[in-house]
């Protein structure tokens, strides 16, 4: 993108832009736009030269031209715009005004051979003006076609023969015989239209000279640097014939590389358009005219690419096989040039003109024979030249693919045995041991199953919470008993309501602090209330005194509060926390008002209210983070040993409220050897999405670069059965590190953020270590797809984020139905190359709510490769994953 030196200025469209909303300026590739204002820098304001419409447009879709311009109100500007307004869309590549590049390459389409001996263009123009006056016969179709195309100018070719000139159009329809036309009865509507066109022709001729028009200056400035001295020899007079309309329309689906010489069997006009076409346009498989009606830019696309290709890709760009990207088509025809042509979509009135002009002519001229399509050699196919991959690169690719492969059950068992023998460390399965416990302990000492009991989390306490939060805090010397009886208990008729009132008041009004008094003594409960802050031990004692004042049994439990960064085999276990135990419905429950406070540093929920999960917790849920000093205070039968309790992963309240459940978890997977990858699996409901990251800051020096300390993981969902949805997380150890922490965030679907961020609260934290050699590895980047909520996509391969040029990769993707009643038969997947080519993935097999797609693709371009899924609701391609090719 270039910045205009002065305003207004002329810019040329590099790509097609259909606009996103009202007020946008629509244009096609190659159009001229007069920039009136640069706006905010990214969106400019301009006027379309062809349509004379104004609007805003993206600045990276155009490039500035160093030519002077005129104001929209001038006569030159209006006449210039009107001179192109009546060009036929079907013949835009033929009827396009001839630019300086066309003159420099092919000065004559049809003419005598002595045309090359003319000294200058000025003398050529004067001679042409004297020898070829305008044809003004209304009864002749030749003059009408001439007026529709453009008025005569100094750029016209010398020795122009009228019949041969109009024999070279792209239209397959026959020329209108003037004699047959004169014998027929003229139509009044046709006569009126001819008069209008003739008047417009005369007006355009008087208003300005095309030799000094902005268009001519524009084309001279843009093509002089490339096409200055090369002038090919024109063919013999009358030897040029253009293809039929059907061939011309078919040619818009193909492209070729620009050529610098005239090929045998080609017309000079076609050769000039080949040379004037830009390489960036030739690299696309489809012409912009194919996808112009549906092309839009998706603003929330997180992954930028070198050229402005939309995140929402039109359907018409799709190729169903990879051969279209790598190999040329055996028979292709050249599409119309977009760099030097000014085309406008055909309207109803223009089509009516053409039908009336062709009326009365049923003959076809024998000289107009369709030209067979031109075959291009393989080296002219627009693809980026890449050398074959070296053996070292192939070995590196093989290692990355093997490293990211999913472990099987047998491999997990072998890994467990290897860790046990190599490191001489016991392997624990804490989740399995916890599930084998009978259950919670009742108040009378009898066990009860975990699933039995009142579910506190589904109860509504909004009325009690609102009443307690309306109480103005008293910063006076008041005892806990007076506060509970006179301020909190009134209006609370049940023991559950009274416990809830005490919990809300203390957790939201008492700020967490680790600082004790100067003499390391605990504050009294009265001091905690008056100061509004307290340590976990002081808060637990305050809860006990207030509940006992309300005749409710409560005791204090001291123990160790696990940190998200604690490794399971740590021996640094000190008493650092305290919480309370109560009885409810003849069942033991736990309350931690200090940890539920929004001011606690380990609080996962970043909100101003307390965390309700830590009100009346079950012992089997509390044991993950709260390790009591006395094993009897676990209130689980049988009691778990200290190593097993420490081996339990750190989980927050989000883990339980969202219904997550770890599986196949043991401590051996937290030890990585050489090039191994950490793999974690857990069950998750269908409306839950997860994000993971690896934090290596705790293992590095304080002066380490923070931007280089985070390596991201790969999180994907798949369905084992129509009812079991599994989230699989893979992570690697950052290079030059021996220890790190895997943090998993979870939340409800619908967050339109890149997966490489943490839009949800942390649900799990798993510290892990690495032994042996290590190698840097990045996974493929996944993006959320809110437009396709009924499909879960799982990338089987390649899961590495870096693709190497010259290597053939096999893309395997599985699509799962999120609901048994949802049909995913219409799922369409594709891969988009850095140059914008789209290759469809083939459906291999399907069944039981899953479809497997595959594609073998050789990486011949460097840049960003995108994985696309067709969103049926909006009819666009949406990006769900990206790779980087190097």
From Swiss-Prot:
Pfam families per record: Ig_CYK3_C, SH3_1, Transglut_core
SMART domains: SH3, TGc
SUPFAM superfamilies: Cysteine proteinases, SH3-domain
Biased composition, class Polar residues, residue ranges: 89-104, 155-188, 253-264
UniProt modified residues of type Phosphoserine: 213
GO (cellular component) term, any one: cytoplasm
Amino acid composition bias (Low complexity), ranges on this chain: 72-88, 135-154
UniProt keyword Chloroplast, yes or no: no
Gene Ontology BP terms: mitotic actomyosin contractile ring contraction; mitotic division septum assembly
Residue ranges constituting the SH3 domain according to the UniProt record: 6-67
Keywords: Cell cycle, Cell division, Phosphoprotein, SH3 domain
Positions of the UniProt region annotated as Disordered: 72-189, 219-290, 358-393
Keyword Cell division: yes
Localization per record: Cell tip
UniProt record similarity statement: Belongs to the CYK3 family.
Its job: Involved in cytokinesis.
Protein name in the entry: cytokinesis protein 3
């Amino acid at each position: 993108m270039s910045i205009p030196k002065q305003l207004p200025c002329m810019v040329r469209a590099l790509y097609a832009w259909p606009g996103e909303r009202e007020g946008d300026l629509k244009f096609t590739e190659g159009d001229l736009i007069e920039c009136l204002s640069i706006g905010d820098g990214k969106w400019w304001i301009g006027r379309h030269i062809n349509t004379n419409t104004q609007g805003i447009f993206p600045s990276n879709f155009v490039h500035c031209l160093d030519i002077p311009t005129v104001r929209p109100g001038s006569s030159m500007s209006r006449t210039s715009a009107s001179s192109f307004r009546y060009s036929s869309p079907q013949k835009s590549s033929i009827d396009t005004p001839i630019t300086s590049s066309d003159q420099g390459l092919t000065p004559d389409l049809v003419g005598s051979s002595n045309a090359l001996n003319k000294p200058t263009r000025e003398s050529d123009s004067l001679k042409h003006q004297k020898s070829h006056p305008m044809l003004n016969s209304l009864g002749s179709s030749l003059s009408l076609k001439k007026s529709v195309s453009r008025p005569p100018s100094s750029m016209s070719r010398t020795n122009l023969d009228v019949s041969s000139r109009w024999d070279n159009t792209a239209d397959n329809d026959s020329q209108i015989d003037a004699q047959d036309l004169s014998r027929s009865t003229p139509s009044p509507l046709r006569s009126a239209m001819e008069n209008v066109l003739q008047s417009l022709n005369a007006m355009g001729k008087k208003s300005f000279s095309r030799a000094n028009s902005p268009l001519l200056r524009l084309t001279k400035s843009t093509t002089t640097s490339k096409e200055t001295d090369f002038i090919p020899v024109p063919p013999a007079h009358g030897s040029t014939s253009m293809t039929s309309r059907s061939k011309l329309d078919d040619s818009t689906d193909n492209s070729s590389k620009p050529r610098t010489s005239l090929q045998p069997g080609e017309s000079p006009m076609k050769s000039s358009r080949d040379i004037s076409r830009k390489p960036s346009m030739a690299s696309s498989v489809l012409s912009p005219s194919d996808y112009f009606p549906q092309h839009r830019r998706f603003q929330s696309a997180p992954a930028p690419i070198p050229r402005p290709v939309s995140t929402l890709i039109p359907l018409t760009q799709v190729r169903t096989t990879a051969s279209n990207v790598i190999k040329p088509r055996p028979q292709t025809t050249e599409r119309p040039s977009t760099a030097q042509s000014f085309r406008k979509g055909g309207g109803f009135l223009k089509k009516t003109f053409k039908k009336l002009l062709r009326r009365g002519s049923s003959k076809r001229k024998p000289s107009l024979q369709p030209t067979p399509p031109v075959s291009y050699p393989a080296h002219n196919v627009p693809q980026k030249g890449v050398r074959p991959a070296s053996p070292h690169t192939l070995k590196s690719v093989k290692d990355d693919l093997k490293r990211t492969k999913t472990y099987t059950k047998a491999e997990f068992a072998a890994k467990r045995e290897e860790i046990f023998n190599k490191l001489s460390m016991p392997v624990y399965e804490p989740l399995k041991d916890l599930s084998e416990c009978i259950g919670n302990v009742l108040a009378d000492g009898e066990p009860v199953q975990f699933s039995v009991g009142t579910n506190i989390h589904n109860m509504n306490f909004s009325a009690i919470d609102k009443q307690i939060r309306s109480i103005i805090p008293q910063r006076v010397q008041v005892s806990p008993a007076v506060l509970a009886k006179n301020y909190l208990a009134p209006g609370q008729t049940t023991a559950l309501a009274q416990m809830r009132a005490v919990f809300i008041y203390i957790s939201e009004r008492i700020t967490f602090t680790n600082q004790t008094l100067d003499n390391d003594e605990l504050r009294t409960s009265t001091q905690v209330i008056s100061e509004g802050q307290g340590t976990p031990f002081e808060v637990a004692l305050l809860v006990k005194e207030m509940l006992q004042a309300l005749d409710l049994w409560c005791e204090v439990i001291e123990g160790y509060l696990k940190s998200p960064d604690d490794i399971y085999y740590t021996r640094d276990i000190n008493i650092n926390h305290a919480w309370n135990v109560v009885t409810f419905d003849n069942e033991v429950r736990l309350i931690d008002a200090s940890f539920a406070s929004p001011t606690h540093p380990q609080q996962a929920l970043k909100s101003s209210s307390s965390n309700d999960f830590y009100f009346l917790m079950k012992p089997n849920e509390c044991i993950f983070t709260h390790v009591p000093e006395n094993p009897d205070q676990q209130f689980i039968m049988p009691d778990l040993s200290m190593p097993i309790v420490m081996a339990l992963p750190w989980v927050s309240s989000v883990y339980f409220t969202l219904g997550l459940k770890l599986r196949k978890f043991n401590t051996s997977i937290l030890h990585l050897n050489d090039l191994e990858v950490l793999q974690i699996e857990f069950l998750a409901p269908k409306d839950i999405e997860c994000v993971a990251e690896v934090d290596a800051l705790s293992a590095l020096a304080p002066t380490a670069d923070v931007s280089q300390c985070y390596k991201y993981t790969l999180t994907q969902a798949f369905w084992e059965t129509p009812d079991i949805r599994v989230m699989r997380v893979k992570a690697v150890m950052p290079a030059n590190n021996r220890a790190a922490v895997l943090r998993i965030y979870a939340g409800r679907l619908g967050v339109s953020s890149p997966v490489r961020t943490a839009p949800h609260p942390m649900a799990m934290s798993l510290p892990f270590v690495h032994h042996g050699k290590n190698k840097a590895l990045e996974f493929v980047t996944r993006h959320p797809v809110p437009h396709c909520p009924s499909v879960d996509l799982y990338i089987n391969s390649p899961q590495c984020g870096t693709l190497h040029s010259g290597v053939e990769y096999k893309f395997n993707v599985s699509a799962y139905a999120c609901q048994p009643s949802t049909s995913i038969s219409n799922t369409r997947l594709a891969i988009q190359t850095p140059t914008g080519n789209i290759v469809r993935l083939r459906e291999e097999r399907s069944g039981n709510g899953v479809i497997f797609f595959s594609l073998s693709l050789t990486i011949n371009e460097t840049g960003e490769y995108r994985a696309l899924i067709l969103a049926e609701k909006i009819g666009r391609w949406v990006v769900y994953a990206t790779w980087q090719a190097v």
